[in-house]
Amino acid sequence: MCLVNEFVSNSNMKPALNVSGDEKELILQLRRYLEEKLTYLLDQNGTVSIGVSGGSMPRVFSKAILSLPQEQLNWKRIRIFMVDERNVDLDSEESNQGEYLRLFPNELRDVFVPMQIFKDPCLTAQHYEISLRKYLLPEQLNNTARFDILFLGVGPDGHTASIFPGKERLEKITELNWVSVITDSPKPPPSRITLTLQTLQHAKNVAFIICGKQKAEIVRGICDRDQKYPAAQARPFNDKLTLFLDEDAATGVPDRDSSDSDSPPPFDG
């Protein structure tokens, strides 16, 4: 299996950069991005599909989207999906979707498309893919879904979603499916469900939220398209990539002074 998807762009387009000094500024930048994208997408599409990750993202994403003028959002046309999840019960402290549900008001929890958890992670993945195919219009090419926006994080090893570095791990991920099972995650718990790299690459917009000096090297790898990092491979093939960074992570941006730092993301939905 080829580790680099055939749809990775060969263009030299740089990611759009948004660098923040603290979490408050980060949330404001995320809010601006969400407001622009959702305004456009809700005007153009029947529904809007958003994929979200775990870690610290539930807190900052929830604060950003819930701070938008609620009267301007048609929540019935917004669907939020998990990019990846640990195969644990919803009430577990390790559950990412459980954390999102705890942060969202009861009346808005229906925007989340649930990932039903089974003891067997393969069953969890199968049922989740069925749900995705029900809610998302598949891309004609390769029958692959196109999320409107994916919000991704990265680990200090360069993993994103639950796609960890290493040839053997990457080769276990079935690119023909939208969802894959991870049973040997280097981070506990070992069993996880994740969107595949091909699914990430087909998204219309991908936004990374990255903070910390220890991730500056990964930021450089993403900007330089260093394929040893899954996070770099997750760049969408249309190159609509936005990085939300703190000052420490931004030290990894090559030639930052001559880049499009703090510029608004490429915008046509």
Curated annotation (Swiss-Prot):
First-tier enzyme category under EC: hydrolase
A single GO molecular function term of this UniProt record: 6-phosphogluconolactonase activity
Pathway this chain belongs to: Carbohydrate degradation; pentose phosphate pathway; D-ribulose 5-phosphate from D-glucose 6-phosphate (oxidative stage): step 2/3
Gene3D superfamilies assigned to the protein according to its UniProt record, in alphabetical order: 3.40.50.1360
Residue ranges, annotated region (Disordered): 248-269
Keyword Membrane assigned: no
Subcellular location: Nucleus
Chief subcellular location: nucleus
Keywords from the UniProt entry: Hydrolase, Nucleus
Name by which UniProt lists this protein: Putative 6-phosphogluconolactonase
